[in-house]
Amino acid sequence: MAKAKVKQDQSPSGSALGKAANSQKQTKKQKKKKFWKNHPKIAGKTSEAKTLFPLLPPKQPQEFSSNWKALQELLKPKLNPAAPATPSEKFPKKDQKVSEKKNGDPEPPKSTPKINGGITSVTPKEAKAPSQAPPTKAVEVKKEKKRKIKAEGTEQLDPPKKPQGGTQPEPPKVDIWFDDVDPDDIEAALGPEAGRIAREMQGVTETAPPTAEKVLVKEKAFEGLTRTVAMDCEMVGVGLDGEESMLARVSIVNLFGKCVYDKYVRPTERVTDYRTAVSGIRPDDIKNGEAFKDVQAEVAEILRGRTLVGHAVHNDLKILFLDHPKKAIRDTQKYKPFKEKVKSGRPSLKLLCEKILNVKVQTGEHCSVQDAQAAMRLYTMEKKCWEAAIKAKYAGVTAAKAKGPQKDKQPPAQ
Protein backbone atom coordinates (compact mmCIF):
# COMPACT_ATOMS: atom_id res chain seq x y z
CA MET A 1 0.00 0.00 0.00
CA ALA A 2 1.11 3.43 -0.84
CA LYS A 3 1.85 5.75 2.03
CA ALA A 4 -0.63 8.59 2.60
CA LYS A 5 0.80 12.02 2.16
CA VAL A 6 0.71 14.18 5.22
CA LYS A 7 -1.15 17.45 4.58
CA GLN A 8 0.88 20.50 5.32
CA ASP A 9 -0.56 22.99 7.73
CA GLN A 10 -2.04 25.83 5.67
CA SER A 11 -2.39 28.25 8.62
CA PRO A 12 -0.45 31.51 8.08
CA SER A 13 2.76 32.05 9.94
CA GLY A 14 3.39 34.83 12.55
CA SER A 15 5.32 37.04 10.11
CA ALA A 16 2.45 36.97 7.64
CA LEU A 17 -0.02 38.10 10.31
CA GLY A 18 2.20 41.02 11.33
CA LYS A 19 2.49 42.22 7.75
CA ALA A 20 -1.29 42.13 7.32
CA ALA A 21 -1.85 44.22 10.48
CA ASN A 22 0.69 46.85 9.36
CA SER A 23 -0.92 47.11 5.97
CA GLN A 24 -4.33 47.67 7.58
CA LYS A 25 -2.96 50.50 9.79
CA GLN A 26 -1.35 52.21 6.82
CA THR A 27 -4.57 52.07 4.83
CA LYS A 28 -6.48 53.66 7.79
CA LYS A 29 -3.99 56.51 8.05
CA GLN A 30 -4.13 57.15 4.34
CA LYS A 31 -7.92 57.28 4.44
CA LYS A 32 -7.83 59.82 7.32
CA LYS A 33 -5.38 62.03 5.43
CA LYS A 34 -7.53 61.99 2.32
CA PHE A 35 -10.65 62.82 4.34
CA TRP A 36 -9.12 65.85 6.10
CA LYS A 37 -7.64 67.06 2.81
CA ASN A 38 -11.03 66.97 1.12
CA HIS A 39 -12.93 68.47 4.10
CA PRO A 40 -10.73 71.18 5.63
CA LYS A 41 -13.63 73.47 6.69
CA ILE A 42 -15.22 70.96 9.03
CA ALA A 43 -12.11 70.83 11.24
CA GLY A 44 -11.99 74.61 11.73
CA LYS A 45 -15.64 75.06 12.66
CA THR A 46 -15.12 74.59 16.37
CA SER A 47 -12.40 77.25 16.63
CA GLU A 48 -14.50 79.72 14.61
CA ALA A 49 -17.53 79.10 16.81
CA LYS A 50 -15.44 79.90 19.88
CA THR A 51 -14.17 83.19 18.52
CA LEU A 52 -17.57 84.38 17.29
CA PHE A 53 -18.99 85.12 20.78
CA PRO A 54 -16.34 86.53 23.17
CA LEU A 55 -17.23 86.55 26.90
CA LEU A 56 -17.73 90.00 28.39
CA PRO A 57 -18.11 91.01 32.06
CA PRO A 58 -21.72 91.60 33.24
CA LYS A 59 -22.90 95.19 33.17
CA GLN A 60 -26.51 94.96 34.31
CA PRO A 61 -27.93 93.24 37.43
CA GLN A 62 -29.87 90.78 35.25
CA GLU A 63 -26.63 89.42 33.76
CA PHE A 64 -25.11 88.31 37.06
CA SER A 65 -24.73 84.62 37.76
CA SER A 66 -27.61 82.75 39.33
CA ASN A 67 -25.13 81.30 41.83
CA TRP A 68 -24.23 84.82 42.94
CA LYS A 69 -27.92 85.68 43.42
CA ALA A 70 -28.48 82.51 45.41
CA LEU A 71 -25.52 83.38 47.65
CA GLN A 72 -26.97 86.84 48.27
CA GLU A 73 -30.29 85.29 49.26
CA LEU A 74 -28.55 83.01 51.74
CA LEU A 75 -26.66 85.91 53.30
CA LYS A 76 -29.83 87.91 53.94
CA PRO A 77 -31.12 87.59 57.55
CA LYS A 78 -34.07 85.31 57.96
CA LEU A 79 -37.31 87.18 58.61
CA ASN A 80 -39.03 84.42 60.57
CA PRO A 81 -36.57 82.91 63.03
CA ALA A 82 -37.41 79.59 64.55
CA ALA A 83 -39.83 80.05 67.42
CA PRO A 84 -38.47 78.90 70.79
CA ALA A 85 -39.79 75.69 72.13
CA THR A 86 -42.50 76.03 74.72
CA PRO A 87 -42.17 74.31 78.06
CA SER A 88 -44.87 71.83 77.04
CA GLU A 89 -42.71 70.64 74.12
CA LYS A 90 -39.75 69.97 76.39
CA PHE A 91 -41.59 67.42 78.44
CA PRO A 92 -43.49 64.50 76.84
CA LYS A 93 -47.23 64.17 77.20
CA LYS A 94 -46.90 61.03 79.27
CA ASP A 95 -44.98 62.87 81.99
CA GLN A 96 -47.58 65.64 82.02
CA LYS A 97 -50.40 63.14 82.45
CA VAL A 98 -48.56 61.47 85.31
CA SER A 99 -48.01 64.81 87.04
CA GLU A 100 -51.67 65.76 86.55
CA LYS A 101 -52.76 62.50 88.10
CA LYS A 102 -50.46 63.01 91.06
CA ASN A 103 -51.39 66.62 91.74
CA GLY A 104 -55.03 66.63 90.53
CA ASP A 105 -58.18 65.37 92.21
CA PRO A 106 -58.62 61.61 92.82
CA GLU A 107 -60.24 59.66 89.99
CA PRO A 108 -63.78 58.28 90.56
CA PRO A 109 -64.09 54.53 91.17
CA LYS A 110 -64.52 52.33 88.12
CA SER A 111 -67.27 50.21 89.67
CA THR A 112 -70.81 51.60 89.67
CA PRO A 113 -72.22 52.50 93.09
CA LYS A 114 -75.13 50.58 94.60
CA ILE A 115 -78.27 52.46 95.65
CA ASN A 116 -80.95 50.60 97.66
CA GLY A 117 -79.55 47.25 96.64
CA GLY A 118 -79.64 48.09 92.91
CA ILE A 119 -76.99 49.03 90.44
CA THR A 120 -77.29 52.40 88.73
CA SER A 121 -75.66 53.08 85.41
CA VAL A 122 -73.09 55.89 85.40
CA THR A 123 -72.26 57.73 82.21
CA PRO A 124 -68.60 58.25 81.34
CA LYS A 125 -69.04 62.06 81.58
CA GLU A 126 -70.31 61.79 85.12
CA ALA A 127 -67.48 59.45 86.05
CA LYS A 128 -64.81 61.78 84.70
CA ALA A 129 -66.32 64.97 86.14
CA PRO A 130 -64.20 66.31 89.03
CA SER A 131 -65.64 66.52 92.49
CA GLN A 132 -66.97 69.89 93.55
CA ALA A 133 -65.23 69.69 96.94
CA PRO A 134 -63.13 72.79 97.70
CA PRO A 135 -59.38 72.23 97.10
CA THR A 136 -57.12 72.05 100.09
CA LYS A 137 -54.41 74.63 100.85
CA ALA A 138 -51.61 72.21 99.98
CA VAL A 139 -53.05 71.68 96.49
CA GLU A 140 -53.37 75.44 95.95
CA VAL A 141 -49.75 76.00 97.02
CA LYS A 142 -48.56 73.33 94.56
CA LYS A 143 -50.55 74.90 91.74
CA GLU A 144 -49.09 78.34 92.49
CA LYS A 145 -45.58 76.87 92.41
CA LYS A 146 -46.31 75.26 89.04
CA ARG A 147 -47.54 78.53 87.60
CA LYS A 148 -44.42 80.37 88.79
CA ILE A 149 -42.13 77.69 87.33
CA LYS A 150 -43.94 77.86 83.98
CA ALA A 151 -43.76 81.66 83.94
CA GLU A 152 -40.02 81.59 84.71
CA GLY A 153 -39.46 78.97 81.99
CA THR A 154 -41.20 81.08 79.35
CA GLU A 155 -39.21 84.17 80.38
CA GLN A 156 -35.93 82.28 80.05
CA LEU A 157 -36.86 80.84 76.67
CA ASP A 158 -38.00 84.13 75.16
CA PRO A 159 -35.08 86.11 73.67
CA PRO A 160 -34.41 89.50 75.28
CA LYS A 161 -36.15 92.26 73.40
CA LYS A 162 -34.07 95.16 72.16
CA PRO A 163 -35.14 98.55 73.48
CA GLN A 164 -37.11 100.49 70.94
CA GLY A 165 -36.12 103.97 69.92
CA GLY A 166 -32.85 105.45 68.79
CA THR A 167 -29.95 104.59 71.07
CA GLN A 168 -27.08 107.00 71.31
CA PRO A 169 -23.86 105.53 69.89
CA GLU A 170 -20.94 105.18 72.28
CA PRO A 171 -18.11 107.66 71.80
CA PRO A 172 -15.14 106.20 69.90
CA LYS A 173 -12.35 104.95 72.10
CA VAL A 174 -8.72 105.88 71.60
CA ASP A 175 -6.89 103.02 69.92
CA ILE A 176 -3.85 102.28 72.09
CA TRP A 177 -2.01 99.32 70.62
CA PHE A 178 0.98 99.32 72.96
CA ASP A 179 0.70 97.69 76.39
CA ASP A 180 4.22 98.09 77.78
CA VAL A 181 4.04 101.82 78.56
CA ASP A 182 3.24 103.32 81.94
CA PRO A 183 -0.32 104.75 81.97
CA ASP A 184 1.02 107.86 83.72
CA ASP A 185 3.31 108.54 80.75
CA ILE A 186 0.40 108.02 78.35
CA GLU A 187 -1.72 110.44 80.38
CA ALA A 188 1.03 113.05 80.28
CA ALA A 189 1.42 112.70 76.50
CA LEU A 190 -2.16 112.11 75.26
CA GLY A 191 -4.37 113.40 78.06
CA PRO A 192 -6.39 112.04 81.00
CA GLU A 193 -8.87 110.13 78.80
CA ALA A 194 -6.08 108.15 77.12
CA GLY A 195 -4.54 107.43 80.52
CA ARG A 196 -7.86 106.11 81.82
CA ILE A 197 -8.28 103.81 78.79
CA ALA A 198 -4.70 102.54 79.14
CA ARG A 199 -5.34 101.67 82.79
CA GLU A 200 -8.54 99.81 81.85
CA MET A 201 -6.70 97.81 79.15
CA GLN A 202 -3.90 96.86 81.54
CA GLY A 203 -6.31 96.14 84.41
CA VAL A 204 -4.78 98.80 86.64
CA THR A 205 -7.09 100.58 89.04
CA GLU A 206 -7.00 104.34 88.81
CA THR A 207 -5.15 105.63 91.84
CA ALA A 208 -5.39 109.00 93.49
CA PRO A 209 -2.84 111.65 92.47
CA PRO A 210 0.45 111.35 94.40
CA THR A 211 0.91 113.52 97.43
CA ALA A 212 3.58 116.21 97.64
CA GLU A 213 5.64 114.15 100.08
CA LYS A 214 5.86 111.18 97.68
CA VAL A 215 7.03 113.41 94.84
CA LEU A 216 9.49 115.52 96.82
CA VAL A 217 11.03 112.87 99.09
CA LYS A 218 12.74 109.69 97.93
CA GLU A 219 11.67 106.66 99.93
CA LYS A 220 14.25 104.49 101.72
CA ALA A 221 17.06 106.91 100.89
CA PHE A 222 20.09 108.07 102.85
CA GLU A 223 19.04 110.31 105.74
CA GLY A 224 22.38 111.95 106.56
CA LEU A 225 24.21 114.97 105.16
CA THR A 226 25.16 114.95 101.47
CA ARG A 227 27.49 117.15 99.39
CA THR A 228 24.44 119.13 98.22
CA VAL A 229 21.85 120.52 100.66
CA ALA A 230 18.79 122.75 100.32
CA MET A 231 17.80 125.40 102.87
CA ASP A 232 14.73 127.52 103.56
CA CYS A 233 13.87 129.95 106.36
CA GLU A 234 10.62 131.31 107.80
CA MET A 235 10.48 134.83 109.26
CA VAL A 236 8.30 136.95 111.53
CA GLY A 237 7.73 140.71 111.57
CA VAL A 238 9.28 143.05 114.12
CA GLY A 239 9.25 146.82 114.53
CA LEU A 240 6.35 149.25 114.68
CA ASP A 241 4.52 148.05 111.55
CA GLY A 242 6.01 144.55 111.46
CA GLU A 243 7.72 145.27 108.16
CA GLU A 244 11.19 144.29 109.35
CA SER A 245 11.92 140.55 109.32
CA MET A 246 13.55 138.31 111.90
CA LEU A 247 14.51 134.64 111.68
CA ALA A 248 11.99 132.25 113.24
CA ARG A 249 12.73 128.82 111.71
CA VAL A 250 15.54 127.17 109.69
CA SER A 251 15.17 123.87 107.77
CA ILE A 252 17.82 121.98 105.78
CA VAL A 253 17.28 118.82 103.67
CA ASN A 254 19.76 116.54 101.91
CA LEU A 255 19.90 115.56 98.22
CA PHE A 256 17.05 113.03 98.61
CA GLY A 257 14.69 115.41 100.44
CA LYS A 258 15.31 113.97 103.91
CA CYS A 259 15.26 116.61 106.63
CA VAL A 260 18.65 116.85 108.40
CA TYR A 261 18.14 120.10 110.35
CA ASP A 262 14.97 121.88 111.55
CA LYS A 263 14.96 124.33 114.46
CA TYR A 264 12.90 127.26 115.71
CA VAL A 265 14.75 130.44 116.73
CA ARG A 266 13.92 132.49 119.81
CA PRO A 267 13.40 136.14 118.79
CA THR A 268 15.71 138.81 120.16
CA GLU A 269 13.09 141.56 119.68
CA ARG A 270 9.39 141.88 120.34
CA VAL A 271 7.37 140.27 117.53
CA THR A 272 4.66 142.55 116.16
CA ASP A 273 3.45 140.29 113.31
CA TYR A 274 3.80 136.51 113.35
CA ARG A 275 2.60 136.26 109.72
CA THR A 276 0.94 132.94 110.58
CA ALA A 277 -1.12 132.83 107.36
CA VAL A 278 2.11 132.74 105.34
CA SER A 279 4.89 131.59 107.65
CA GLY A 280 2.89 129.14 109.77
CA ILE A 281 4.69 130.43 112.89
CA ARG A 282 2.77 130.76 116.17
CA PRO A 283 3.86 132.25 119.51
CA ASP A 284 4.20 128.81 121.13
CA ASP A 285 6.61 127.68 118.39
CA ILE A 286 9.30 130.28 119.01
CA LYS A 287 8.69 130.82 122.71
CA ASN A 288 11.12 128.03 123.64
CA GLY A 289 13.28 128.19 120.50
CA GLU A 290 17.06 128.06 120.18
CA ALA A 291 19.29 131.10 120.51
CA PHE A 292 20.05 132.88 117.27
CA LYS A 293 23.86 132.64 117.62
CA ASP A 294 23.74 128.88 118.24
CA VAL A 295 21.56 128.29 115.19
CA GLN A 296 23.78 130.56 113.08
CA ALA A 297 26.92 128.64 114.03
CA GLU A 298 25.32 125.24 113.38
CA VAL A 299 24.02 126.27 109.95
CA ALA A 300 27.40 127.76 108.98
CA GLU A 301 29.08 124.48 109.92
CA ILE A 302 26.64 122.47 107.77
CA LEU A 303 27.01 124.74 104.72
CA ARG A 304 30.81 124.81 104.79
CA GLY A 305 32.21 123.09 101.67
CA ARG A 306 28.79 122.09 100.33
CA THR A 307 26.60 123.15 97.40
CA LEU A 308 23.61 125.18 98.60
CA VAL A 309 20.23 124.93 96.84
CA GLY A 310 17.26 127.20 97.51
CA HIS A 311 14.62 129.49 96.10
CA ALA A 312 15.68 133.14 96.42
CA VAL A 313 18.35 131.77 98.75
CA HIS A 314 20.08 135.16 99.06
CA ASN A 315 17.22 136.25 101.38
CA ASP A 316 17.85 133.26 103.66
CA LEU A 317 21.58 133.95 103.84
CA LYS A 318 20.89 137.62 104.55
CA ILE A 319 18.58 136.91 107.50
CA LEU A 320 21.21 134.52 108.95
CA PHE A 321 24.03 137.05 108.46
CA LEU A 322 25.96 134.41 106.52
CA ASP A 323 27.81 134.33 103.23
CA HIS A 324 28.40 131.50 100.75
CA PRO A 325 30.54 131.21 97.59
CA LYS A 326 28.55 132.19 94.49
CA LYS A 327 30.02 129.24 92.60
CA ALA A 328 28.40 126.84 95.13
CA ILE A 329 24.87 128.37 95.05
CA ARG A 330 22.00 126.93 92.95
CA ASP A 331 19.04 129.32 93.02
CA THR A 332 15.87 127.94 91.39
CA GLN A 333 14.43 131.44 90.99
CA LYS A 334 17.37 132.57 88.81
CA TYR A 335 17.78 129.45 86.63
CA LYS A 336 17.05 130.51 83.03
CA PRO A 337 15.45 127.25 81.74
CA PHE A 338 12.90 127.44 84.58
CA LYS A 339 12.10 131.04 83.68
CA GLU A 340 11.51 130.05 80.04
CA LYS A 341 9.26 127.12 80.93
CA VAL A 342 6.91 129.13 83.13
CA LYS A 343 7.38 132.37 81.15
CA SER A 344 8.15 134.52 84.16
CA GLY A 345 11.10 136.74 85.05
CA ARG A 346 10.90 135.98 88.79
CA PRO A 347 8.87 132.76 89.14
CA SER A 348 7.55 131.76 92.54
CA LEU A 349 8.26 128.35 94.04
CA LYS A 350 4.55 127.55 93.92
CA LEU A 351 4.39 128.24 90.17
CA LEU A 352 7.50 126.17 89.42
CA CYS A 353 6.18 123.17 91.35
CA GLU A 354 2.77 123.39 89.70
CA LYS A 355 4.10 123.66 86.13
CA ILE A 356 7.21 121.47 86.30
CA LEU A 357 6.64 118.98 89.14
CA ASN A 358 2.83 118.84 88.81
CA VAL A 359 2.59 119.23 92.60
CA LYS A 360 0.80 121.87 94.63
CA VAL A 361 2.77 123.46 97.47
CA GLN A 362 2.21 126.56 99.61
CA THR A 363 -1.57 126.19 99.29
CA GLY A 364 -2.01 127.50 102.83
CA GLU A 365 0.53 128.11 105.54
CA HIS A 366 4.12 127.72 104.33
CA CYS A 367 6.43 125.04 105.68
CA SER A 368 10.18 125.62 105.46
CA VAL A 369 10.87 121.86 105.24
CA GLN A 370 8.52 121.40 102.26
CA ASP A 371 9.88 124.50 100.51
CA ALA A 372 13.44 123.20 100.85
CA GLN A 373 12.35 119.78 99.53
CA ALA A 374 10.64 121.40 96.53
CA ALA A 375 13.76 123.44 95.67
CA MET A 376 15.92 120.31 95.92
CA ARG A 377 13.56 118.30 93.70
CA LEU A 378 13.66 121.02 91.03
CA TYR A 379 17.46 120.98 91.19
CA THR A 380 17.77 117.19 90.91
CA MET A 381 15.57 117.21 87.80
CA GLU A 382 17.99 119.55 86.00
CA LYS A 383 21.17 118.56 87.84
CA LYS A 384 23.14 117.29 84.84
CA CYS A 385 22.38 120.23 82.57
CA TRP A 386 22.72 122.74 85.39
CA GLU A 387 26.13 121.45 86.52
CA ALA A 388 27.37 121.24 82.92
CA ALA A 389 26.41 124.88 82.34
CA ILE A 390 28.14 125.99 85.57
CA LYS A 391 31.27 124.03 84.67
CA ALA A 392 31.42 125.52 81.17
CA LYS A 393 30.85 129.04 82.53
CA TYR A 394 33.64 128.93 85.11
CA ALA A 395 35.98 127.04 82.76
CA GLY A 396 35.73 129.91 80.28
CA VAL A 397 36.35 132.49 83.01
CA THR A 398 39.46 130.71 84.29
CA ALA A 399 40.81 130.33 80.74
CA ALA A 400 40.33 134.04 80.06
CA LYS A 401 42.09 134.93 83.32
CA ALA A 402 44.97 132.60 82.54
CA LYS A 403 45.63 134.27 79.19
CA GLY A 404 45.34 137.90 80.40
CA PRO A 405 46.76 140.91 78.45
CA GLN A 406 50.11 139.73 77.00
CA LYS A 407 52.78 142.30 76.00
CA ASP A 408 55.03 141.77 73.00
CA LYS A 409 58.39 140.74 74.31
CA GLN A 410 61.43 142.13 72.47
CA PRO A 411 64.25 139.70 71.78
CA PRO A 412 67.28 140.30 73.99
CA ALA A 413 70.16 142.27 72.42
CA GLN A 414 73.21 140.25 71.65
From Swiss-Prot:
GO terms for cellular component: nucleus. It is an enzyme of class 3 (hydrolase). InterPro entries: Exonuclease_RNaseT/DNA_pol3, REX4_DEDDh_dom, REXO1/3/4-like, RNaseH-like_sf, RNaseH_sf. Its EC number is 3.1.-.-. Residues 1-174 are annotated as: Disordered. This is RNA exonuclease 4. SMART domains: EXOIII. Keywords: Exonuclease, Hydrolase, Nuclease, Nucleus. One of its GO terms (biological process) is rRNA processing. Residues 228-379 form the Exonuclease domain. CDD domains: REX4_like.
